[in-house]
Structures are given as C-alpha cells and as structure tokens.
A protein has these predicted regions:
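Hydrophobic small-molecule pocket/channel-lining residues, especially in calycin-type beta-barrels
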Residues: 21-153
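Positively charged n-region of N-terminal signal peptides that target proteins for export
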Residues: 1-10
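Bacterial N-terminal signal peptides
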Residues: 9-18
Length: 153
C-alpha cells in the first residue's frame, strides 16, 4: 500500500511538472531594456518568474520603481480571468490573467476594484522572448502605454 501511495504521489508530481513546463509562459524572464519602450515614470520589472504552485501559478516580480528603489510583488492564482490578490505592490491589490491561447495572456490589474493597468503578454513562437504590451493610469492619474520585452533565462 505504501509503495502504491508513493508511486501515485511521484506520478502526480511528474505530471504537474510536465504540464507546467509545457506552458511557454512558465519560467524566469529577464528584462531586455534595449528592446523595450517604457512610459516615463513607470516602474521597471527587471525579473519575472512564473512557477507552479500546486494547481495555481505563482508570479514573482522584482524590479525598480520610478525613483530606482527595489520593488517586489507576488501573485498566485489561475489563468481564468478572475481577480486574485497581489502582495507587495502599492499600485495594485488584485490582478487577473486570462489565457487567450498557448502563447498569449490578457492581464488586468486593479486597485480598490478600479482597473489601473490592462494588457497582453505574448511569448514568441520559439519560446525565447516575451512581449508585454500594457496601458493604464499611473499613481499620479496620468495615462501611459509601454511595450516591454523579456528574454527567457
């Protein structure tokens, strides 16, 4: 009985890992500043990590704010279009991701129930590049648009 339980647990772990690695969004993504176009005053997310967290996905974002101070935020949820809490970001308290196809996500960030940022995340066909196109309103109420490129690590 113990052998069967252990075997089942290992099989589930390997299945979860296979599903996770099959998703091109998963992994560590590093900012390619030379290929990116930032709106003035918008924080720069230098490293973004997508990883499995049980049946959910955990996204960890490390970067710099407009003053050059280190930032760190985390989101854990599903790519189902529903809002899940964000921790560590003063400009958003909820974020949702919706899977459009195997390489594309739609993202919406909210603060106090109000949409502050929305955009699209597309992984290249070769899986080596990720382009994030977003628009929204910054903390000062100014509209912005950015196109940010990341390279898979």
């Amino acid at each position: 009985m113990k052998t069967n339980t252990t075997g089942l647990a290992l099989a589930l772990c390997f299945f979860g890992a296979a599903v996770c690695f099959a998703d091109p969004q998963m992994g560590t993504w590093k900012l390619n500043e030379a290929k990116s176009k930032f709106a003035a005053g918008v924080p720069k997310n230098e490293m973004v990590v997508y990883e499995a967290a049980g049946e959910n996905v955990k996204i960890t974002v490390d970067g710099k704010d407009k003053d050059g101070n280190a930032t760190h935020n985390e989101w854990t949820g599903k790519f189902d279009g529903k809002d899940y809490p964000v921790t560590g970001d003063p400009n958003q308290d909820a974020r949702s991701y919706k899977k459009v196809n195997d390489r594309t996500l739609e993202m919406t960030a909210k603060k106090d129930g109000k949409v502050t940022v929305s955009g699209r995340i597309v992984v290249s066909a070769d899986g080596k590049t990720r382009t994030v196109t977003v628009g929204g309103t910054d903390a000062d109420g100014k509209k912005f648009q950015s196109k940010v490129v990341y390279d898979k690590q």
